[in-house]
């Protein structure tokens, strides 16, 4: 039997246990100053190359605009950090309570600015980060449609205006309707800081079905109304036109309250043509109780009337047969209007008011347009629809559609899917392929 092995005993003296260092105000202060200084340093400017090298990455203009906003926020943050560092480095005195209060106040202010700045930094980090995802090409395609709309409008104004920069930026948000956030408005998601460029929010279900993307034209039109200083001129024109025709005062004010959504539809139709109407009906064609329901504080026209505005404008653009067809379908879908909840002064005068409202929006010569009317700045004629239909055939065949404007590709893919020229998946792929290579 083997002898038991004796354990090896380490004859070296054991190391003394670490002695906890007492927490002092000075150590606490130094730690807080270090933390917020590192927070400040981490909230640095963005670089364009950190979002990849594809065509989908943010433009230099978008990066610069966000960095300028971050720079504005870092100035008070830097001051707050400096105050905290001074408080942390001040010598101990007998008035410890006073020193602690000064320190804690400085710490709280610095952290408030850290949170405010980081909220903005995080928002744009996630926004720009979408461009590195599988949806990057889709989003930059939407950017190019929006840019085409802006360029076309600003090229045809009656007088020169300062060029807006940077252009709109599209991003995806699932589970929501299309929306937009205008340049220069305070945003809650930015801590009430001003938005440096227009944002166009698009849901996934629209992006995957680009023939429903008339929403881009509508949302971009909201931005253009403000970029062109028409936010007051348009409702005033509506009230004036209706008042001159003897419309009831209540009806005048309701139509004026709806001016932004009406303008978005009218300009969207002038930009995109008849496919815009089809896309609009996709959205507002719902159950009768929804289509006929009036919202006393709503900014959207009651859907039943909203569709008729577009039918009237489409007819005046030279598409009378198409407009009559849409109107006939609309009336077959909603033959009974007896359950509507609209005020009598609005509903009973609507048929007379609709042409007046449309003319007020597209026919008034606005100062913001260089004393031109909207239909003089933007127009869509039957010849443009011929271009769209030719482009639809090319998209379906995977052929380069040529020099057609980006915004017309929405109509082209709509025609192609409605006529079954190719499988929807093929049309979606070709739509984004064409826009992404421009």
For the regions a language model picked out, list residue spans one by one.
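Short, conserved phosphate-binding/catalytic loop or strand-edge motifs used
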Residues: 121-122, 193-198, 237-247
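Hydrophobic (often cysteine-bearing) scaffold residues that line and stabilize catalytic clefts
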Residues: 142, 213, 260
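Non-catalytic terminal regions of proteins
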Residues: 2-140, 144, 148-149, 165-170, ...
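Active-site-adjacent "gating/activation" loops or surface patches in catalytic cores
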Residues: 164-198, 225, 229-236
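Active-site recognition of the HExxH zinc-binding catalytic motif
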Residues: 211-231, 265
């Amino acid at each position: 039997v083997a002898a038991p092995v004796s354990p090896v005993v380490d004859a070296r003296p054991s190391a003394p246990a670490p002695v906890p260092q007492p927490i002092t105000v000075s150590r606490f202060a130094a730690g807080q100053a270090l933390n917020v200084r590192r927070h400040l340093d981490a909230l640095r400017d963005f670089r364009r190359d950190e979002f990849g090298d594809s065509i989908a990455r943010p433009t230099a203009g978008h990066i610069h605009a966000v960095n300028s906003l971050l720079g504005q926020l870092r100035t008070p943050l830097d001051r707050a950090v400096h105050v905290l560092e001074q408080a942390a480095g001040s010598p101990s005195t007998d008035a410890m309570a006073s020193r602690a209060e000064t320190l804690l106040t400085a710490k709280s202010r610095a952290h408030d600015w850290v949170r405010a700045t980081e909220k903005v930094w995080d928002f744009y980090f996630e926004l720009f980060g979408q461009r590195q995802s599988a949806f990057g090409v889709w989003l930059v395609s939407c950017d190019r449609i929006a840019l085409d709309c802006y360029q076309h409008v600003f090229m045809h104004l009656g007088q020169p205006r300062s060029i807006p920069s940077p252009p709109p930026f599209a991003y995806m948000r699932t589970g929501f309707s299309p929306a937009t956030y205008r340049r220069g408005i305070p945003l809650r998601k930015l801590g009430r800081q001003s938005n440096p460029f227009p944002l166009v929010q698009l849901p996934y279900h629209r992006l995957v079905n680009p023939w429903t993307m008339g929403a881009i034209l509508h949302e971009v039109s909201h931005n253009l109304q403000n970029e062109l200083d028409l936010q007051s001129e348009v409702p005033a024109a509506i009230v004036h036109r209706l008042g001159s025709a003897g419309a009831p005062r209540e009806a005048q004010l309701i139509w004026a309250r709806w001016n932004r959504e009406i303008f978005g539809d009218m300009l969207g139709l002038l930009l995109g043509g008849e496919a815009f109407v089809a896309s609009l009906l996709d959205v507002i064609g719902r159950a009768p109780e929804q289509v006929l329901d009036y919202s006393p504080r709503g900014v959207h026209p009651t859907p039943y009337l909203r569709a008729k505005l577009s039918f009237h404008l489409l007819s005046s653009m030279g598409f009378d047969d198409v407009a009559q067809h849409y109107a006939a379908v609309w009336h077959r879908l909603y033959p009974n209007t007896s359950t509507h909840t609209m005020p009598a002064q609005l509903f009973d005068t609507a048929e007379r008011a609709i042409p007046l409202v449309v003319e007020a929006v597209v026919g008034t010569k606005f100062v913001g347009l260089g004393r031109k009317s909207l239909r003089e700045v933007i127009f869509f004629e039957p010849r443009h629809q011929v271009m769209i239909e030719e482009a639809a055939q090319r998209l379906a065949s995977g052929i380069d559609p040529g020099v057609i404007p980006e915004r017309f590709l929405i109509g082209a893919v709509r025609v192609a899917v409605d006529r079954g020229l190719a499988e929807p998946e093929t049309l979606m792929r070709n739509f984004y392929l064409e826009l992404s290579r421009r």
